[in-house]
UniProtKB/Swiss-Prot annotation:
Catalysed reaction equations from the record: D-arabinose 5-phosphate + phosphoenolpyruvate + H2O = 3-deoxy-alpha-D-manno-2-octulosonate-8-phosphate + phosphate
Keyword set includes Transferase: yes
Organism (species): Chelativorans sp. (strain BNC1)
Name recorded for this polypeptide: 2-dehydro-3-deoxyphosphooctonate aldolase
Subcellular location: Cytoplasm
Length: 276
């Protein structure tokens, strides 16, 4: 089985030759109220721009730098919130999974199961996610060459699921540093699945603040523009109304009220990149 070059998630279409789509939301699920506020505002932005949109949030940040780091609301609290976001707001929902058992539990509550970058080669996890029949978004590991994602995608498609997204989120370059090799985007596109560019984790500085990760949100738009100019199916952007006080990944998240202008500029680049 080969991956589908066009993956539809709700009203959003992800394809390397289709108009740009968006995956966006806060790093972690903080509360029901916060989730509805963020999802509602992002949905409104996307609708005004005519942009396909999937809401992302993580119920458990299982790879925090420190044991003391806040990890999110947890699975039990997340399940009804995810279901209500889909039903009441009509937004597709993406969340991370970390174990095989979580895949089946979450399958009825979300639209996309995301494999974290650190776990992208875990065969049992990939197979379990694939067998739910949900769309699977795999973050390319910071340690992985782009051409090696072919084997990752093959584990999912061989398990009977052709609906795969692959996401570039930077590659390790020395200690506490990531860089983005834009060649990875067309290389990954050759695999046949839609390619997403994660603009916010690409500016992360893993473990860069000692007991937490740092980052530099100044460069989110720089990298996002470059990726969209190369040509991608979608962008992945973590955003928060108050990034400096967010429980995780604040240094690399985009201020929520700056999202509309950023998205407008990225859509302009996308139109040029995909013009015939």
């Amino acid at each position: 089985m080969i991956p589908n070059p066009r993956v539809e998630i709700g009203q959003a279409v992800f394809a390397n030759d289709a108009p740009l789509a968006l995956i966006a939301g806060p790093c972690q699920l903080e509360s029901r109220e916060h989730a509805f506020e963020m999802a509602g505002r992002l949905k409104e932005m996307a609708e005004k721009l005519g942009l396909g949109f999937v809401y992302k949030t993580s119920f458990d940040k299982a790879n925090r730098t420190s044991l003391l780091g806040k990890r999110g609301a947890g699975l039990d609290a997340a399940l009804p919130i995810f279901a209500d976001l889909r039903r009441e707001l009509g937004v597709p929902v993406l969340t991370d999974v970390h174990t095989e058992g979580q895949c089946e539990i979450l399958a009825d509550a979300v639209d996309v199961l995301q494999i974290p970058a650190f776990l992208c080669r875990q065969t049992d996890l990939l197979v379990a996610a694939a067998k739910t029949g949900k769309v699977v978004n795999v973050k390319k590991g910071q340690f992985l060459a782009p051409w090696d994602m072919k084997n990752v995608v093959a584990k999912i498609t061989a398990s009977g699921n052709p609906n795969v997204l692959t996401t570039e989120r930077g590659v390790s370059f020395g200690y506490n540093t990531l860089v983005t090799d834009m060649r990875a985007l067309p290389i990954m596109a050759e695999i046949g699945a839609p390619v997403i560019f994660d603009a916010t984790h690409s500016v992360q500085q893993p473990g860069g603040q000692g007991s937490s990760s740092g980052g530099d949100r100044r460069f989110v738009e720089t990298l996002a523009r470059a990726a969209v100019a190369v040509g991608v199916a979608g962008v992945f952007i973590e955003t928060h109304q108050d990034p400096d006080n967010a429980p995780s990944d604040g240094p690399n998240m985009v201020q929520l009220d700056k999202m509309p202008a950023l998205l407008e500029r990225l859509m302009a680049f996308d139109r040029i990149a995909k013009s015939k």
